[in-house]
Each structure stands twice: as structure tokens, then as C-alpha cells.
Curated annotation (Swiss-Prot):
Organism: Homo sapiens (Human)
Classification via Gene3D superfamilies: Regulator of G-protein Signalling 4, domain 2 (1.10.167.10)
Keywords: Cytoplasm, Glycoprotein, Lipoprotein, Membrane, Nucleus, Palmitate, Phosphoprotein, Signal transduction inhibitor, Ubl conjugation
Compartments it resides in: Membrane; Nucleus; Cytoplasm
Cellular component per GO, a single term: trans-Golgi network
PTM info: Fatty acylated. Heavily palmitoylated in the cysteine string motif. N- and O-glycosylated in synapsomal membranes.
Assembly, per entry: Forms a complex with G(alpha)z/i2 subunits and mu-opioid receptors; the formation of this complex results in mu-opioid receptor desensitization. Interacts with OPRM1.
Domain RGS: 262-378
Protein name: Regulator of G-protein signaling 20
InterPro entries: RGS (IPR016137), RGS_sf (IPR036305), RGS_subdomain_2 (IPR044926)
Bias (Low complexity) ranges: 185-197
GO molecular function, one term: GTPase activity
Start and end residues of each stretch annotated as Disordered: 138-199
Disulfide bonds: none
Length: 388
């Protein structure tokens, strides 16, 4: 065990000679001077007590006591550990090794072509990091050559044929070549490919992505694309068939006067619907009349396919929340329409049509009667009748 020097021992003796310090270690010295041979036996109410004869020593006798060397030995251990701890804290950290700079000399000839160099200036930090990552990539070609494009360039068919024959799977290559030979005349002799259609003759001859991996037929994809285009063309035709403006003769003075009697008389005539729709356009609510008219046209259809297509068009134009011409419907009616869209019928929008009809009757019809559109029309017809 390491021992303290003579100077440190003298300092500790002076320090512990104080009364306040002596009282802290007083039980230790009393225990050392405990005399077990001297006991005074007293009998007090039947209990035996051993009263030791403890001699207390003044602070001046601390250096002469036999417990002082043991105390010094106990204190030397924590003091030495504290000294080692503080010396470790005050010790300087070892110098760091200098960082190795990346060598971009193989890539410097390619920098002017890529417009990345500025004379002899130092490369930016971000660019150096990118170049370092490029150098760390496995399989990089030596000499700074440019990397190959990610997508392979299509090779001529002769090279593909030779590559397929020289591949380790000759059966797969031969089957692929046979499939291509069969597809080329089949695509050229397809009756559905009219000469007037752009790209119809070359669509089957060009190999698609599936032919390279699955060896499927391109003719089936061509037929599928043509079938997918048919509903689109039909939907455009059906969308054009939906009424946007009704042809009607000029209304008479009696008809215009009858519009003021009830909303039903206004909606029953084409001239009344056109006049009312012109008013709704000024209030930015023309979609209500368009939706009502589209539902009336849907009720006249009998073909199931046309009904399904027209129902889908009406849903996309007026029911969908993504449509700019969405009509105002409550949640119950929307839920019913969404459930019935699986198998739509002629009357799928009856509840929605009635709700929009009621909305126009209560909200828009009174304002139409007081609008300038109706008053000007009524005044012009009245003047014509007077002149006649």
C-alpha cells in the first residue's frame, strides 16, 4: 500500500489536531483503548449492564496514539485514487491523425467535359463527397470512363438471334425466335389493323417488354388495347348525346305567363327549361338543370350497356366529389347511389333528381320570377302582341 510522505503526515497531524476534526474520529480511538478486563457489574432492577471503562484522550495525544498510523493508511488509499483521477482529467488528449484527402486525379480529365471544374480552384465540398461516393462504388471501370446507361439499348434482331443461339440455354433462345417469327406475320395479317390507323401495322411487329421475359404474344396485347379504347370512344359519344341545350320554338305570351303559375309548368316546356337554365348560369348553378336533364335522358334508355355507361358518366360529372360540377346531395342519397353503382339501372338517380328538383323549386324558382331574364322576355312578348 502506498505511504504518505513525512510532510503530508505532518500536515495531516496539524489538521486533525483541531477539536472539530478530533470529534469526528473520537469513537475510533476510544474503541482502540477499550479495556475489556475492567467491568463494573451493577444490578439495576434485575438487569445486568456492562459499563466499560473508556478513557478519553485529549487532542494533544493524537500523534502518540497507536490508531494514528492506521488512520493514515486508510486515508492514503482514497487520496491516491483522487490524485490519479484528477491527473487523468488534466491529461491532454492524444493528437488526432490527419484525415486522408481523397484523390480525384483519375476523374480530373473528365471534369471539363462535364462542366464541373473551374480552372485550378478547389472542388466544392458537396462535389467532392459525390465523387468520393462514386469512387467507392464497386465495379467502377478504371481510367475514369463514363458509366453505361441504366437502360440497355435495343440491339438489332440479327445480334439477338446470335446471342440467343450462343446462350447457355439454347432451347429457350430457339423458342423465343420461333415465337417472334410467328408474331410478325400474325401481326401483319391481322384483319383488325386497318391501313388508315396510325401505328396499326407496326404495333404487332415491335416487340413489347413482355416478349423479352414472358414470351407472350403481342397480338393479344394489340387486341386488348383496341378493346380498351372502345368504351372510351363510346363514352365520348354518349357524353355528346346528353342534352346541353334543347331546341325549342319561341315561347308564346300564354306560355310565359303560365310559368309564373307553377314550377311544374316551367319545367314541362323546353322553352321554359332553356330560359330557366340561362338564369341559373348567371347564379353559377347551371349544373342542377344539367343533372336533371341527364337523368331524364337516362330514363329513356333500354339497352343495359348504354344505361351502365350513361350512369357512370352522370356519376363522374355530377355525383363525384372530385367533379367541378358536383351537385348538392345529402349523405343518405349518396350512399344509396354508391351501393347501386355496382349494377346501375334507369332509376338509379331518382332520389337525387327529386332532391335537386326540390332545391330548384324552393331556392332558384322564386328568384327567376323576379329576375331580369323573365321580365325582359315577358315585356318583349307583350309588346309583340300589342303590335300585332
Amino acid at each position: 500500500m502506498p505511504q504518505l510522505s513525512q510532510d503530508n503526515q505532518e500536515c495531516l497531524q496539524k489538521h486533525f489536531s483541531r477539536p472539530s476534526i478530533w470529534t469526528q474520529f473520537l469513537p475510533l480511538f476510544r474503541a482502540q483503548r477499550y479495556n475489556t478486563d475492567i467491568h463494573q457489574i451493577t444490578e439495576n432492577e434485575g438487569d445486568l449492564r456492562a459499563v466499560p471503562d473508556i478513557k478519553s484522550f485529549p487532542p494533544a495525544q493524537l500523534p502518540d496514539s497507536p490508531a494514528a498510523p492506521k488512520l493514515f493508511g486508510l486515508l492514503s488509499s482514497p487520496l491516491s485514487s483522487l490524485a490519479r483521477f484528477f491527473s487523468h482529467l488534466l491529461r491532454r488528449p492524444p493528437p488526432e491523425a490527419p484525415r486522408r484527402r481523397l484523390d480525384f486525379s483519375p476523374l480530373l480529365p473528365a471534369l471539363p467535359a462535364a462542366r464541373l471544374s473551374r480552372g485550378h480552384e478547389e472542388l466544392p465540398g458537396r462535389l467532392s463527397l459525390l465523387l468520393g461516393a462514386a469512387l467507392a462504388l464497386p465495379g467502377r471501370p478504371s481510367g475514369g470512363r463514363p458509366l453505361r446507361p441504366p437502360h440497355p439499348v435495343a440491339k438489332p434482331r440479327e445480334e439477338d438471334a446470335t446471342a440467343g443461339q450462343s446462350s447457355p440455354m439454347p432451347q429457350m433462345g430457339s423458342e423465343r425466335m420461333e415465337m417472334r417469327k410467328r408474331q410478325m406475320p400474325a401481326a401483319q395479317d391481322t384483319p383488325g389493323a386497318a391501313p388508315g390507323q396510325p401505328g396499326a401495322g407496326s404495333r404487332g411487329s415491335n416487340a413489347c417488354c413482355f416478349c423479352w421475359c414472358c414470351c407472350c404474344s403481342c397480338s393479344c396485347l394489340t387486341v386488348r388495347n383496341q378493346e380498351d379504347q372502345r368504351p372510351t370512344i363510346a363514352s365520348h359519344e354518349l357524353r355528346a348525346d346528353l342534352p346541353t341545350w334543347e331546341e325549342s320554338p319561341a315561347p308564346t305570351l300564354e306560355e310565359v305567363n303560365a310559368w309564373a303559375q307553377s314550377f311544374d309548368k316551367l319545367m314541362v316546356t323546353p322553352a321554359g327549361r332553356n330560359a330557366f337554365r340561362e338564369f341559373l348560369r348567371t347564379e353559377f348553378s347551371e349544373e342542377n338543370m344539367l343533372f336533371w336533364m341527364a337523368c331524364e335522358e337516362l330514363k329513356k334508355e333500354a339497352n343495359k350497356n348504354i344505361i351502365e355507361e350513361k350512369a357512370r358518366i352522370i356519376y363522374e360529372d355530377y355525383i363525384s366529389i372530385l367533379s367541378p360540377k358536383e351537385v348538392s346531395l345529402d349523405s343518405r342519397v349518396r350512399e344509396v347511389i354508391n351501393r347501386n353503382m355496382v349494377e346501375p339501372s334507369q332509376h338509379i338517380f331518382d332520389d337525387a333528381q327529386l332532391q335537386i328538383y326540390t332545391l330548384m323549386h324552393r331556392d332558384s324558382y322564386p328568384r327567376f320570377m323576379n329576375s331580369a331574364v323573365y321580365k325582359d322576355l315577358l315585356q318583349s312578348l307583350s309588346e309583340k302582341s300589342i303590335e300585332a
